[in-house]
Amino acid sequence: MNMIQNILRVILGSKFERDLKKLIPIVGQINSLEKEMKETSDSLLSSQTQKFRERIARGESLDSILPEAFATVREVSLRTMGMRHFDVQMMGGIALHRGNIAEMKTGEGKTLTSTLAVYLNSLAGKGVHVVTVNDYLAKRDANWMKPIYDFLGISVGVIQHDMDHEQRKIAYSADITYGTNNEFGFDYLRDNMVSHKDHKVQRSHFFAIVDEVDSILIDEARTPLIISGSSDETTDKYVRINKIIPKLVAIEDFEVDEKARNVLLSEKGVSHVEEILGIENLYAPENVDLVHHVHQALKAHKIFQKDVDYVVQNGEVIIVDEFTGRLMAGRRYSDGLHQALEAKESVTIAKESQTLASITFQNYFRMYDKLAGMTGTADTEAEEFRKIYDLDVIVIPPNVSVRRKDSPDRVYRTEKEKFDAILAEIRELQSKKQPVLVGTISIEKSEILSKMLSSAGIQHNVLNAKFHEREAEIVANAGKPGAVTIATNMAGRGTDIVLGGAQLYKENLETWKDDDDLVRRFKESILKQELDNAELLIREMDSSVKQKRASEILESVKIWKKNHEDVLVAGGLHILGTERHEARRIDNQLRGRSGRQGDPGSSRFYLSLQDDLMRIFGSDRISGLMKWANMPEGQEIESKMVSNAIARAQKRVEGHNFDIRKHLLEYDDVMNRQRIVIYKMRNEVLENEDISSLILSFIEEAVENQIVAHCEGNNPSSWNLDSLKEWLEGLELNLEINEEDFKKTKNPQLALFEKVNAAAKQKYEDRAESIGKDIWKLLERNIFLDILDHRWKEHLYSMDHLREGIWTVGYSERNPLVEYKLQGFRMFDVAIENLKNEVVNFLFRVEVSENSKLPEERREYKKVGQEVTGGFQELSSGTPSPTVTVTTSSGGGTERKTSRRRKR
């Protein structure tokens, strides 16, 4: 197979080469327009947007205007921000517009690149979403690129976590909306819980560009977005089960599977749990919930580690993001795991939540007509992007070749030997004033290393979830001569580490608002690094205040320049990895912090055989080799065999994690199909003022089901007319039905259906007429939405419990996923049937009194027994309207009986 691939590569070129060949001619077309754009006045350039929109309205495609649109953005960027898009950024923009992932190295200007595709697609008028990993980056990028969009007459909105409903609606109505993946996802869920179409904030899902796409679509893919409310279940069970765990003995009672991050009870362990709890059979059907919580408690104690997976702050268990090391305040583990951790740490246990709405990032982002992404590290996950999202990864070459030197890993036998070697390396780097970024995989490891450095008298900064408030300051100083910065994973990602430290003088220039020509020329000289000229301009200034401020800025530039030169001489930023991550991509992200835009830099990873990756997934051959070589303590090993073993271990873990994400998606796809049906039905009700045709179809179906259930066949003597009459009375529909009348007909069952259906429809129309058609329309929509939301909430709860216990079917050699699909479909079918029946029952029995008010918005019905009472506020027109009392019939929704269709 490899031979064939090599032959094809020689004939066709590599994928990288083929991709570039497709992009280069288009970049040539864009460049050919540059001279024309430079000669265009500001007013004509800003009018391009309207011209493009008119051409699109006439049927021209976005592809056909791409060269002109991209050339326009490049010229506007140069005029407004002094930044000209490089050719490689043009390539990135084309890749994004075509719905691909553009892999661009750190420092290559992904934010500026995105403006090309964002502007072009915004011309369609359907809204473009730019997705970032946090609020800070969303706001920063929007404000940073806003001058380009303002010049071109394109509106920009930003979604922030603390925004209210109206602010969000305004932001989404803009041509371009920046925000985080969480905010976009939660707003979608909330939009499908509103009571009026005007209360929705999002428009269509037309085009999205996801920044740090690997972080959002892969790292966070295992975490669904959930809107929940507290359930009525007690938290006592968590305390009770938590007390069991210390009594269980490892190996005898349970086995820890570190690879799968799971704990399995042995037969002896099952017996032990049964004995402690005083039950006969732990795996009896009624104990499925108990088994689930025992397993969650075991995981909480044996898999999840404090200061690695979570921290305890102010009496709360807070999740630590395994990929960035950031605290995820407000996020909770689902399925009772978070409660198990709270019980373990003896803090207040929050009630387990009940799902009201949920979606995974996979299914949310797959809704977009076109999806694109940017990152510095996507190629190692190209298969997953292609299979799950139908996204191709296009590797964009750097504008300036990477000069960073990546040294081979150094492997030690023990963690102590590794840390001793790291300490020695940091000492040496600091002695020659080379800044070093030390990457760790957990808060715990970062604090161990910090204590060692403090004991050795080495000044350093720590950037982890516990010190996130100082993140910007720490990252700003990480490039200073001799700076030592310890960071968990990719904390600080999204902010470049500048060699020599942050260029604070640029902020001073921006905040200095003065129209004086000398001040303007001074600023230009500083930005061009023409320091001698800047000094001359200071002497010409007529104000001592201005001279003082300018001198301070010039001095800070000189200090930064000296620091910058010292770091360049020392070799640039050095990356010191203290452990390999499970994914090669995360290691590459750490390395990518150094060597930006052609800067010098270096990197090396220090490993030990006690590291989790080596211990759990590594080969025993490495350990055997080091013992065989009789290596003295502290001696490292560098060999191709070791490097290959590490790469194989990482590939195994990546494959394992991909399987987990794929498996989760297969389960969520079941819910997604159901979600689509419910949301489509909900939107149909929101979009249409008159839903009478939908209600009439429900009535017809309800009548049909009752007749099939009680009056099957064409022999009236065998019919159960009493049960049918009881159902009709429940609808307050008094209808004379005599079996003798139907014996004379050609098709008795059809004749019965037509009579009952006609009477039911007439009753419905009479009710609408008596209450008033306008009030009735609003009333039936409100009632429909209330019942729909209630039934959907109940169904989600049932599906959660089904999923928790579905694994038990594996004991009878049935496929849990297949069984989940089958049972989930049956449950959904019943939920829809119950919804239709309940809507019909409510509408036939609703009572409306005079001199009260009907709301513009529905309010939730409060159920007491079988009565539902809702008090209404007022119509938007101010018309007085009634209080509504709704009583359901005792014949509520039941499981649908399988039946043949009636004959007509």
Swiss-Prot record:
Reaction(s) catalysed (UniProt annotation): ATP + H2O + cellular proteinSide 1 = ADP + phosphate + cellular proteinSide 2
Record's bilayer topology term: Peripheral membrane protein
Compositional bias ranges of the Low complexity kind: 876-889
Keyword Cytoplasm: yes
Disordered: annotated segments: 870-904
GO CC, alphabetical: cell envelope Sec protein transport complex; cytosol; plasma membrane
Residues given in the record as ATP binding sites: 89, 107-111, 496
Alphabetic keyword roster: ATP-binding, Cell inner membrane, Cell membrane, Cytoplasm, Membrane, Nucleotide-binding, Protein transport, Translocase, Translocation, Transport
Protein's UniProt keywords contain Glycoprotein: no
Sample GO molecular function, one term: ATP binding
Origin: domain of life: Bacteria
One of the GO biological process terms: protein targeting
Subcellular location: Cell inner membrane; Cytoplasm
Enzyme class: translocase
EC identifiers of the protein: 7.4.2.8
Oligomeric and partner information: Monomer and homodimer. Part of the essential Sec protein translocation apparatus which comprises SecA, SecYEG and auxiliary proteins SecDF. Other proteins may also be involved.
Cited function: Part of the Sec protein translocase complex. Interacts with the SecYEG preprotein conducting channel. Has a central role in coupling the hydrolysis of ATP to the transfer of proteins into and across the cell membrane, serving as an ATP-driven molecular motor driving the stepwise translocation of polypeptide chains across the membrane.
Family recorded in the similarity comment: Belongs to the SecA family.
Designated name of the protein: Protein translocase subunit SecA
The organism of origin for this protein: Leptospira borgpetersenii serovar Hardjo-bovis (strain L550)
